[in-house]
Amino acid sequence: MAPGFTISFVNKTIIVTGGNRGIGLAFTRAVAAAGANVAVIYRSAKDAVEVTEKVGKEFGVKTKAYQCDVSNTDIVTKTIQQIDADLGAISGLIANAGVSVVKPATELTHEDFKFVYDVNVFGVFNTCRAVAKLWLQKQQKGSIVVTSSMSSQIINQSSLNGSLTQVFYNSSKAACSNLVKGLAAEWASAGIRVNALSPGYVNTDQTAHMDKKIRDHQASNIPLNRFAQPEEMTGQAILLLSDHATYMTGGEYFIDGGQLIW
């Protein structure tokens, strides 16, 4: 950072959905390192509470994990209200929860569609809406960062001229990116900013299970010639949540190693 450029979230509460693993955990650690109290929303991971508590102890902030199905409106609303009561006024949200199904399009089912879209689109909307409603009731400003993906713009390859068969994931991320624009437009007058952060290929447990040939092919087509580390996603998220980004809303910011240059 340039001299004098600092970001502090001391005495602020930030929610991270899917904040117990992968990119989400990197977000959780980053906002905690900046002084925020952090609420981690998770679906079913057995170690989520332990992971969240460990972050709190490491950075000396309040942290708490909340089990919640982001596609369930009533549960999301109650969870957001509980976070506000437990950790103090919510100042930011990173809507990061996401899932994928990798299958040829001819084999995909309605259940697959619901599984992906319930989390990646409706779950994002559900969480953003619950937080925004709370802010509107309190006449409070806030910032939302939605984790979309560079896959909102492309069809990922598995090999030269070969498609990675995840059409529901890619289309859900395109929907997610456009959802951000709509929410940003509706809530701007209330001082609520909404932006999308769109990662490229990142080293996570999920990508680690991919075929090495696919990973190598994908990395070879990135101008920076490698997958990112989860921590490399955090700088843009921290900026968007901060007071240094008060004139930024409705944008989609790609952290993709230059992939979309091509």
Curated annotation (Swiss-Prot):
Q: Which GO terms describe its molecular function?
A: mannitol 2-dehydrogenase (NADP+) activity; NADP binding; oxidoreductase activity, acting on NAD(P)H, oxygen as acceptor
InterPro entries with a match to the protein in the record: NAD(P)-bd_dom_sf (IPR036291), SDR_fam (IPR002347)
Family classification: Belongs to the short-chain dehydrogenases/reductases (SDR) family.
Q: What is its EC number?
A: 1.1.1.138
Q: Where does this protein come from, organism-wise?
A: Agaricus bisporus
Subunit: Homotetramer.
Q: What gene name is listed for this protein? A: mtdH
Q: Where is the active site?
A: S149 (proton donor), Y169 (proton acceptor), K173 (lowers pka of active site tyr)
Reaction(s) catalysed by this chain, per the record, are:
D-mannitol + NADP(+) = D-fructose + NADPH + H(+)
What is a biological process (GO) this protein takes part in? protein homotetramerization
Q: Where does NADP(+) bind?
A: I23, D69, N96, R129, Y169, K173, V202, T204, Q206
Keywords from the UniProt entry: NADP, Oxidoreductase
What protein does this entry describe?
NADP-dependent mannitol dehydrogenase
